[in-house]
């Protein structure tokens, strides 16, 4: 079994960027066994070029959970 994790962030690079969406799929080689997807409030504005790239807007994440609010779920699904 393995996990496939996809994240979208507020920008390129690793310094100062925040997650805006996370998707996790648990795969056994034949089929997806578990799936988790959530928008994430990055607590900073999403630049227009990232919105154009991902389709994720500031309005979409305004009331989404902050990462620390879903961290336990992320940990549990990837154990």
Question: Where is each model-derived feature located?
Answer:
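Conserved non-catalytic scaffold segment of RNase H-like nuclease domains
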Residues: 1-79
């Amino acid at each position: 079994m393995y996990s496939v994790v996809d994240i979208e962030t507020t920008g390129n690079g690793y310094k100062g960027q925040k997650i805006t969406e996370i998707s996790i799929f648990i795969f056994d080689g034949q089929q997806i066994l578990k799936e988790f997807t959530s928008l994430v409030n990055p607590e900073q504005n999403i630049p227009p070029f990232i919105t154009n790239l991902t389709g994720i807007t500031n309005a979409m994440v305004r009331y989404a959970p902050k990462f620390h609010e879903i961290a336990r779920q992320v940990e549990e699904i990837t154990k």
